[in-house]
C-alpha cells in the first residue's frame, strides 16, 4: 500500500468515525437525567455513557445484523425465546430444565401449602388459579425444539398436589382448550400472556368454582365490560428478536389486541354490596393479572359479581407478590373472604425470588407446609371427584 493510499484509508476511516459520532450526538438534544444523577456521585456519567451506547449506530447495526443471521440461518433468537412455526413465539421458561428442579418443586409445593395455612389462620379461603403454559395449549406451532421432560406433566402434577392439600384449584386448561377449539385465540402469538378472551374464560371458571365451593357473602354487584379500542400489539417475546429498525420486515408481525375496560354498572347507593372496609376478593399473581392489557381483574369482577382488590405485580413471579401481601397491613387489618393466587405452571420448578422477605420466615412457611403434606401422604385416600385434569389432555 502506497503512502497516498494509507493517508486516504486513514482519512476515510476518520471521516466515517466522525460522521457516526455526530449522528450519535444528535440524540443528546433534549436528553436529561434524574435530579439525583450528579457528576459527584457518578450517576450522571453513567447515564450519559448508557445513552450514548444505546444510540451509537455501529452497535445497533451490529446487533441487527447478528440477530438477522441467527433468525434466518439458524431459526434462533436471543436467550428468552423459542421460535415456532407460523410466527409463533414461546418463552423458553416453558422449555428449559431448571437447576435443582426436583428440590425446587418440593420447596414450592410446601410453600403453597404453608401459605394456605397462613391464610386459613386469618379466615381467608385460598383459591389457586394455575395458568397452563402457552406451549401446552398451542403445541401445533412448535418447531424442532421441545420442552424438557420436567414440563411434560407439570400442570397435572401441580393440580394433584394441591388437591391432596385440599386447596381449591379449578382446571383452567380444559375450558381454554374448548374455547380454542371453538375458534377463540386464548394466548397471544408473540407474547407470553393470554388474550383478553383467555383471561375472561379463566375468570368465569374461577367464579363458577367459587360460587360452588366458597360462595361470597351478600348480594352480587353488576359489572360491565366494554371494548375501548383495538391496537397493534408488540408482544413481549419480540424483544428477544432485536431486528428493528433495519430488519423490521423480518420480525413476526404485530397482532391486534382489543383493549377492554370493566366498570361498576350504575346502581342506587343502597345496593352497594360491601362497605368501604370490606374486601370480598383479593388477587395475588404475576403479569397475567397485573397487566391491564388482558383485563383479568375486570373479567373477575364481572364473573364474580364482586369487587376484586389486586396485589399482583409485574415481573416478580408468583411467590414474591404473595410474600409481600402476607407482610402487608391490608392482610392484617382488612383480610378478604377469598384470595385468588394466580400461579403460572412454569414457575413451579424454578427457584423463585423472595425479594427482601426474611429467609427464615419463608423457611418456616415451607416447613409448616411440608409437615402437612407428609401427613396427607400418610392418610388413606378418599376416592372422590377431583378437578385434577386428566393427563390425556396434555
Swiss-Prot record:
The active site is at 191, 193 (proton acceptor), 287 (nucleophile). It is an enzyme of class 2 (transferase). Its main location: membrane. Keywords: Acyltransferase, Alginate biosynthesis, Cell inner membrane, Cell membrane, Membrane, Periplasm, Signal, Transferase. The keyword DNA repair does not apply. One of its GO terms (cellular component) is periplasmic space. Its EC number is 2.3.1.-. The keyword DNA-binding does not apply. It is found in: Cell inner membrane; Periplasm. InterPro entries: AlgJ (IPR034657), ALGX/ALGJ_SGNH-like (IPR031811). GO terms for biological process: alginic acid biosynthetic process. Pathway: Glycan biosynthesis; alginate biosynthesis. Together with AlgI and AlgF, forms an inner membrane complex which probably interacts with the alginate polymerization-transport complex and adds acetyl groups at the O-2 and O-3 positions of mannuronate residues. Acetylation of alginate is important for the architecture of biofilms and increases the ability of alginate to act as a defense barrier. This is Probable alginate O-acetylase AlgJ. It comes from Pseudomonas fluorescens. Belongs to the AlgJ family. Residues 1-37 form the signal peptide.
Amino acid at each position: 500500500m502506497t503512502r497516498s493510499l494509507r493517508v486516504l484509508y486513514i482519512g476515510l476511516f476518520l471521516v466515517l468515525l466522525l460522521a457516526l459520532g455526530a449522528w450519535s450526538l444528535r440524540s443528546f438534544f433534549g436528553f436529561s437525567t434524574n435530579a439525583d444523577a450528579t457528576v459527584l456521585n457518578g450517576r450522571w456519567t453513567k447515564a450519559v455513557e448508557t445513552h450514548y451506547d444505546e444510540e451509537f449506530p455501529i452497535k445497533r447495526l451490529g446487533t441487527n445484523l447478528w440477530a438477522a443471521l441467527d433468525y434466518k440461518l439458524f431459526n434462533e433468537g436471543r436467550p428468552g425465546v423459542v421460535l415456532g412455526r407460523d410466527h409463533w413465539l414461546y418463552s423458553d421458561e416453558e422449555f428449559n430444565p431448571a437447576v435443582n428442579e426436583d428440590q425446587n418443586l418440593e420447596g414450592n409445593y410446601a410453600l403453597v401449602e404453608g401459605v394456605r395455612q397462613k391464610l386459613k389462620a386469618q379466615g381467608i379461603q385460598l383459591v389457586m388459579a394455575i395458568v397452563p403454559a402457552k406451549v401446552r395449549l398451542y403445541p401445533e406451532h412448535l418447531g424442532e425444539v421441545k420442552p424438557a421432560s420436567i414440563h411434560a406433566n407439570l400442570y397435572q402434577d401441580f393440580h394433584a398436589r394441591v388437591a391432596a392439600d385440599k386447596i381449591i384449584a379449578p382446571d383452567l386448561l380444559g375450558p381454554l382448550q374448548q374455547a380454542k377449539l371453538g375458534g377463540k385465540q386464548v394466548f397471544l402469538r408473540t407474547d407470553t400472556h393470554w388474550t383478553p378472551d383467555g383471561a375472561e374464560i379463566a375468570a368465569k371458571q374461577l367464579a363458577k368454582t367459587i360460587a360452588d365451593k366458597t360462595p361470597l357473602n351478600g348480594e352480587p354487584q353488576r359489572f360491565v365490560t366494554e371494548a375501548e379500542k383495538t391496537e397493534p400489539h408488540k408482544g413481549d417475546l419480540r424483544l428477544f428478536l432485536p431486528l428493528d429498525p433495519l430488519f423490521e420486515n423480518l420480525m413476526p408481525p404485530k397482532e391486534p389486541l382489543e383493549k377492554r375496560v370493566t366498570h361498576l354498572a350504575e346502581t342506587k347507593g343502597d345496593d352497594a354490596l360491601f362497605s368501604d372496609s370490606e374486601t370480598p376478593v383479593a388477587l395475588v399473581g404475576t403479569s397475567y393479572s397485573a397487566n391491564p392489557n388482558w383485563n383479568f381483574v375486570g373479567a373477575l369482577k364481572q364473573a364474580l359479581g364482586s369487587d376484586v382488590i389486586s396485589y399482583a405485580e409485574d415481573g416478580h413471579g408468583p411467590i414474591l407478590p404473595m410474600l409481600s401481601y402476607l407482610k402487608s397491613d391490608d392482610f392484617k387489618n382488612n383480610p378478604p373472604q377469598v384470595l385468588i393466587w394466580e400461579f403460572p405452571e412454569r414457575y413451579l420448578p424454578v427457584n423463585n425470588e423472595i425479594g427482601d422477605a426474611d429467609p427464615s420466615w419463608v423457611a418456616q412457611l415451607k416447613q409448616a407446609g411440608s409437615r402437612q403434606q407428609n401427613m396427607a401422604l400418610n392418610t388413606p385416600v378418599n376416592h372422590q371427584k377431583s378437578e385434577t385434569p386428566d393427563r390425556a389432555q396434555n
